[in-house]
Amino acid sequence: MTQNIGKITQVISAVVDVKFTNNGKLPEILNALECYNDKQRIVLEVAQHIGDDTVRCIAMDSTEGLIRGLEVIDTGNPIRIPVGTETLGRIMNVVGEPIDGKGEIKSATISSIYKPAPDFINQSTERDILVTGIKVVDLLAPYAKGGKIGLFGGAGVGKTVLIMELINNVAKAHGGYTVFAGVGERTREGNDLYHEMIASGVINLEEPEKSKVALVYGQMNEPPGARARVALSGLTIAESFRDMNAGQDVLFFVDNIFRFTQAGSEVSALLGRIPSAVGYQPTLATDMGELQERITSTKHGSITSVQAIYVPADDLTDPAPSTSFAHLDATTVLSRQIAELGIYPAVDPLDSNSQVLDPMIVGEKHYGVARQVQQVLQTYKSLQDIIAILGMDELSEEDKLTVSRARKIQRFLSQPFHVAEVFTGVEGKFVNLDDTIEGFKGLVEGQYDDLPEAAFYMVGTIDEAVEKAKILKI
């Protein structure tokens, strides 16, 4: 079969026009085209057909050095990447090329990054809790195995640290494979994560096949085409792990889903599409749906996905984060007000929610304690205006007691993280679900009313708070 060869006619930023004149056959939409710039392979993805003989493409790499007249080859397929166990312990880019300097990824299977979502009949609906060891999450917005979890927050409130702690707590204890897709985030964080995984043994450099994680990066400095597709590349690897063996559980981390939307918006503008609300692409809901519908559990195995979602200007009604809400089973909202109090993780206990917080799934005791905790915190929130204007002395005795308990609960929701040990010097804590429930049950019932607030700050279990109180009294 003869190759379909075209020539570049125009390069504008990440958009490249290619003219095919030989046999009049235009490459299909989403086909990958290849050209070589100083021996470096550059992949272009067909986005539009213009006239009878020209296609408009989005480049997956820098277009610097591309010139008019350069030959372009139609591969006849969409972007395809290596999948399977050979990807474990490796870092690749959006088109499946290794970027860790460890040589070629020799996989027997290559797969297209575009796939249909599993049929309804093949999807699984079982619900189990995924214990994270983070008190505020496990108690108030528990995660479901095989569910979709969103971490919402503005700039600098701790989304990436929370994702790193989840990788530390869940991926290490988890028997299956993990895939991490770095979408448009800081290269430094990607590098730190890689070296942390090597140090903790999640990545085995000597025998990569014994590693537990595959990494796919399309960082902030990449062109929009790469950032718009790298989440699909990561998901393709996660799907291959899920479907490889029966009963295989896969963890899929994405940092950051907003950058996927942002890159889609850039691509849309470059292609000259009319923007929709707040300047986003008109296909925002479709793009998000195509990605999210593929992240699902089937009868073969499950994909549990944790997605960091940046909230522009802390506005949860922005179209990008609000489009994601509909697809999620649990939302963990990080709040700047709580971060300003010095409480980390800065999870908002009233804004965060989960479909799994149901007495039929978590049990009556867990559900009852969680709702009591939220009730105390909600009462405290409603009293804050009165306290600000009139002071604590004007409150009734009952309200004073509620405020005292709420402040202790607020501090007890903080927790030292393993991944932050380097910065804080405080040893990280993993708290079992039963200990979490017992601790908060004692707090709302007033068993610890005599202990000072400071005893509850940055501890693991309630026993540690009691010990800390004894030290504070000395």
Swiss-Prot record:
Query: Which purpose does this protein serve, as stated in its record?
Result: Produces ATP from ADP in the presence of a proton gradient across the membrane. The catalytic sites are hosted primarily by the beta subunits.
Cellular component aspect of the GO annotation = plasma membrane; proton-transporting ATP synthase complex
**InterPro entries (UniProt xref):** AAA+_ATPase, ATP-synt_VA_C, ATP_synth_F1_bsu, ATPase_a/bsu_AS, ATPase_alpha/beta_chains, ATPase_F1/V1/A1_a/bsu_N, ATPase_F1/V1/A1_a/bsu_N_sf, ATPase_F1/V1/A1_a/bsu_nucl-bd
Task: Give the GO molecular function terms.
Answer: ATP binding; ATP hydrolysis activity; proton-transporting ATP synthase activity, rotational mechanism
Subcellular location as annotated: Cell inner membrane
Q: What is its EC number?
A: 7.1.2.2
Residue positions binding ATP: G153, G154, A155, G156, V157, G158, K159, T160
Q: Could you name the domain of life of the organism this protein comes from?
A: Bacteria
Subunit structure, interactors included: F-type ATPases have 2 components, CF(1) - the catalytic core - and CF(0) - the membrane proton channel. CF(1) has five subunits: alpha(3), beta(3), gamma(1), delta(1), epsilon(1). CF(0) has three main subunits: a(1), b(2) and c(9-12). The alpha and beta chains form an alternating ring which encloses part of the gamma chain. CF(1) is attached to CF(0) by a central stalk formed by the gamma and epsilon chains, while a peripheral stalk is formed by the delta and b chains.
Q: How does it sit in the membrane?
A: Peripheral membrane protein
Q: Which Pfam families match?
A: ATP-synt_ab (PF00006), ATP-synt_ab_N (PF02874), ATP-synt_VA_C (PF22919)
What protein name is recorded for this chain?
ATP synthase subunit beta
Keyword Flavoprotein in annotation: no
Family that this chain belongs to = Belongs to the ATPase alpha/beta chains family.
Name the reaction it catalyses: ATP + H2O + 4 H(+)(in) = ADP + phosphate + 5 H(+)(out)
Q: Where are the transmembrane segments?
A: none
What keywords sit in the KW lines? ATP synthesis, ATP-binding, Cell inner membrane, Cell membrane, CF(1), Hydrogen ion transport, Ion transport, Membrane, Nucleotide-binding, Translocase, Transport
Write down the Gene3D superfamilies for this protein, in alphabetical order.
Answer: 2.40.10.170, Bovine Mitochondrial F1-atpase, Atp Synthase Beta Chain, Chain D, domain 3, P-loop containing nucleotide triphosphate hydrolases
